[in-house]
Design a protein with these regions (language model features):
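Mixed-charge, Lys/Arg-rich low-complexity intrinsically disordered regions
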Residues: 2-17
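Acidic, low-complexity, intrinsically disordered interaction modules
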Residues: 22-78
Length: 81
């Protein structure tokens, strides 16, 4: 087993699969040394017109923080393969 770097696009394109499988991620952020373990968190929000609810996924870190995929603090995303 080894850590493999994946892109944000891969996460976005496969977020439902990763969420359902409880895929563990390891995230490297700008402001923290080492990797932080994370999973996908799912929540619902209304669109801009408050007419339709969208499902949104973001990273939820074991430390209790959360971040969207496009967070500028995220430098690298890894999974175990």
């Amino acid at each position: 087993m080894e850590l493999v770097e994946i892109t944000r696009e891969e996460v976005i394109n496969n977020c439902e699969k990763y969420y359902e499988n409880r895929q563990q991620f390891f995230i490297k952020t700008k402001h923290k040394e080492g990797l932080e373990s994370a999973y996908l968190y799912q929540w619902e929000k209304y669109d801009d017109n408050f007419e339709e609810i969208k499902v949104v996924y973001c990273f939820y870190y074991d430390s209790g923080n959360s971040a969207p995929f496009d967070d500028e603090d995220i430098e690298h995303i890894y999974i175990i393969q």
